[in-house]
Amino acid sequence: AAAGGAAFLLGSDHIVAKLLADNSYSSDTPDFWRRDGMRYPSHAGRFTGEPAYYSHVLGASHRLLEMTKTNPADYDYCILHSPNGKFPREVARRLGFTSAQLAPSLLVDYIGNAYSATTMLSLAAVLDIARANQKIFMVSYGSGAGSDAFVWETTKELVSLQKAKAKTKQLVAYQIQQKTYVDYVQFLKLTH
């Protein structure tokens, strides 16, 4: 597992990506929990896949595609919550997205599961490489709760942001390349 975070400024000036559509899909599916006083959470094993993650991410995806009258070929990028490498690849396959549309967002292959930060970190990574007027299909997932789905369209303002981030070494790919490994003893010191 990993930890991470991403921050975005929302507003009406210098927009780098416009939100075109969104929707939510939820149910009471307790697949991941932490009881009061427990240091680490528990999960329901295989139940976490099909009735939880897949149901919600596919449900939100289908709703958004129907709502926008679009199909996967209409998008340049696909971002799916990535608790592991298998789940988003399988959902993308079921929906009809290509591996080329999905690959730039699969940070899980490099940093592990960043939990609730996953889709936002992936959006930041995609915005680092996208061009103006490209569409991004994005679906988050919150264990036991549901999924939120979004359609973004990049603008010409994105280019100036990319240049500024490159100068200050703030691109997601650069930050991943500059990682620092810690051994088990260092890990224990950092977590206790």
Annotate each language-model stretch with its function.
Residues D76-H192:
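Claisen-condensing/thiolase-fold acyl-transfer catalytic domains that form or cleave C-C bonds
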